[in-house]
């Protein structure tokens, strides 16, 4: 009867009460138990008071109780039935994984953004390439057109040069005829001047002797002084005029030296095309017109330009390797 009563009394005690009684029998304090089990004092107190902390999982609580029972020498089998009541195993609530779905959604959005970015980049690169190709093709067509125009201009200039030679010769011959006629008329006049009166004998003798000499005087000596006189009088005038014209022309002179074959076109302020064609290597071109000049040069690196004795800067066209289109004036030359 005593054994059964003791057993019933033991079953009536809760898990926490039995653990506290065993601790007190061993003379241990809650602080000592907490230090040995590496627990908080509040956790040991909750176990002895049969409290289940809300923030503590039942699995951990059952483990703490088992460790506490081993420490105070209580068999684990005696505590198992009471542990089911004191710390029942609660079903864990499995929360849906939001992080994976959010990451997948974010990854999908980033994928669309990257695709759009690459698409924009490809479009920009394509447009840039198309613009460069069109510009390059236009330059090639322009250079081809310039070369065709230059060859045609060279052919025309060759034909015009061949036709102009006889015309200049004829004009020179025609201009010389009036001068000869003038000299003849001037030489005849001194011969026809009246002679002083002479006796009949002297007249006859003089006619016999002088007649041959008069023929010679009419043919050669008379022409020579009059011709030289006319040349000395008339030639200085065109020389002075040419000097004045050369001085005026040099003020707007445009000099170009070529280090390689180059096509160019030069137009003055009146719209007159001074030159249009191809210049060969080591060539020099001197042009005079009314400033300012408009120049179109196919190869700027192959030409050196001087205007009014000052060089014209073509470096900006040489760097870009493009056809040079510029206007040369006195202000631009002074600024350079």
Swiss-Prot record:
GO cellular component, one term: plasma membrane
Domain HTH cro/C1-type per the UniProt entry, residue ranges: 19-71
Cytoplasmic topological segments: 1-111
Protein name: Cytoskeleton protein RodZ
HAMAP family reported for this sequence: RodZ
Gene Ontology terms describing biological process: regulation of cell shape
InterPro entries: Bact_Cytoskel_RodZ, Cro/C1-type_HTH, Lambda_DNA-bd_dom_sf, RodZ, RodZ-like_C
Domain notes from UniProt: The helix-turn-helix (HTH) motif in the cytoplasmic domain of the N-terminus is involved in the formation of spirals to maintain the rigid rod shape. As this protein is anchored in the cytoplasmic membrane, the HTH motif may contribute to protein-protein interactions to form the RodZ helix, which is localized beneath the cytoplasmic membrane. The C-terminal domain may be critical for determination of the rod shape by probably interacting with enzymes required for synthesis of the peptidoglycan layer, including PBPs in the periplasm.
Family in the record: Belongs to the RodZ family.
Stretch list, region Disordered: 152-235
Domain of life from the UniProt record: Bacteria
Pfam families, A to Z: HTH_25, RodZ_C
Residue ranges that the UniProt entry lists as topological domain Periplasmic: 133-336
Job description of the protein: Cytoskeletal protein that is involved in cell-shape control through regulation of the length of the long axis.
Major localization listed first in the record, in broad terms: membrane
């Amino acid at each position: 009867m005593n054994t059964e009563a003791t057993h019933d009394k033991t079953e009536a005690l809760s898990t926490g009460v039995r653990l506290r009684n065993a601790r007190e029998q061993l003379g241990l304090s809650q602080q000592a138990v907490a230090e040995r089990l590496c627990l908080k004092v509040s956790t040991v107190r909750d176990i002895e008071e049969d409290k289940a902390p809300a923030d503590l999982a039942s699995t951990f609580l059952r483990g703490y109780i088992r460790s506490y029972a081993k420490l105070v020498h209580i068999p684990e089998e005696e505590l198992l039935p009471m542990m089911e009541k004191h710390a029942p195993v609660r079903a864990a609530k499995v929360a849906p994984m939001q992080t994976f779905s959010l990451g997948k959604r974010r990854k999908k959005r980033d994928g669309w953004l990257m695709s759009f970015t690459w698409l924009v980049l490809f479009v920009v690169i394509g447009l840039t390439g198309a613009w460069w190709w069109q510009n390059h093709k236009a330059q090639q067509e322009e250079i081809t057109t310039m070369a065709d125009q230059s060859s045609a201009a060279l052919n025309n200039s060759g034909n015009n040069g061949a036709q102009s030679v006889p015309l200049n010769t004829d004009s020179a011959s025609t201009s010389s005829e009036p001068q000869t006629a003038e000299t003849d008329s001037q030489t005849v006049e001194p011969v026809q001047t009246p002679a002083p009166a002479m006796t009949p004998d002297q007249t006859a003798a003089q006619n016999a002797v002088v007649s041959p000499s008069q023929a010679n005087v009419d043919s050669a000596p008379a022409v020579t002084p009059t011709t030289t006189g006319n040349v000395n009088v008339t030639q200085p005038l065109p020389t002075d005029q040419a000097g004045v014209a050369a001085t005026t022309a040099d003020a707007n002179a445009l000099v170009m030296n070529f280090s390689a074959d180059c096509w160019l076109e030069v137009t003055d302020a009146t719209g007159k095309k001074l030159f249009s064609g191809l210049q060969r290597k080591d060539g020099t071109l001197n042009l005079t017109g009314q400033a300012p000049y408009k120049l179109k040069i196919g190869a700027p690196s192959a030409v050196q330009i001087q205007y009014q004795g000052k060089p014209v800067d073509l470096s900006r066209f040489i760097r870009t390797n493009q056809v040079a289109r510029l206007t040369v004036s006195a202000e631009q030359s002074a600024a350079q």
